A protein has these predicted regions:
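N-terminal signal peptide c-region/cleavage motif recognized by signal peptidases
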Residues: 14-16
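Positively charged n-region of N-terminal signal peptides that target proteins for export
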Residues: 1-4, 20
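Residue-level marker of positions within ordered structural domains that often coincide
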Residues: 6, 121, 184
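Sec-dependent signal peptide hydrophobic core
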Residues: 5-12
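Primarily secretory-pathway and cell-envelope proteins
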Residues: 21-86, 135-196
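Mid-length scaffold segments of soluble, non-membrane domains
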Residues: 83-138
Length: 196
């Protein structure tokens, strides 16, 4: 009985002490506002378009050149044309994701309605290859080639001016259009058609 009374007393005392703790004080009315949150280095972006009446989107993170002109796509650059590690997530952070509400032909790859991960093979600096991969939810540099739905060559060009932040773009004109990737002094595009 003594132990029961001691335990009950301890529980009561602990409850009383915890109830007396002060809540954090709110800042005084003249206190400066807290510092604004820092913008992410590679902010999330989304390109959208309609081809053949089907909504298409590409979700990606957009890194910036940030004073590294001429140092992005070089032998020892940020995104190197290294034949031993040629596949690029074509963005930053999580892998770039394509979502389509309808069946498409992207270049010569049949892409059924659904969600996919996009990679770009840049081992040949003059001829990039778009890779449509069935495995989604990847982070960073993870790539499983056994999950490729297909690969298609991209048309290379130079943008009219330096592209500071990586950008995907979807342009649709009825049942056809283009998907374009541009960053720094590189631009690569691929034709897209609604698949019947």
């Amino acid at each position: 009985m003594k132990h029961l009374l001691v335990c009950a007393g301890l529980v009561f005392a602990a409850t009383t002490v915890l109830a007396q703790q002060n809540a954090p004080a709110s800042p005084p009315p003249n206190a400066p506002a807290s510092a604004p949150k820092k913008a992410p280095a590679s902010p999330p972006e989304k390109a959208t378009g309609t081809i053949g009446g089907h909504e298409i989107s590409i979700s990606y993170s957009s890194p910036g050149v940030k004073g590294r002109e001429g140092k992005i796509f070089t032998k020892d650059g940020l995104i190197s044309h290294n034949p031993h590690y040629p596949v690029w997530r074509a963005g930053a952070n999580g892998a770039t994701t394509l979502e389509t509400a309808g069946d498409l032909m992207i270049g010569d790859v049949h892409v059924p309605a659904g969600k996919y991960t996009l990679f770009v093979d840049i081992s040949d600096p003059d001829q990039w290859t778009l890779i449509v991969n069935k495995k989604t939810g990847e982070w960073g540099l993870a790539y499983d080639g056994s999950q490729d739905l297909g690969k298609t060559k991209m048309q290379m060009s130079k943008p009219s001016s330096m592209v500071e932040n990586l950008k995907w773009d979807i342009k649709g004109d009825g049942g056809k259009g283009t998907i374009t990737l541009a960053w720094e002094d590189h631009e690569a595009s691929v034709p897209v058609m609604a698949h019947k």
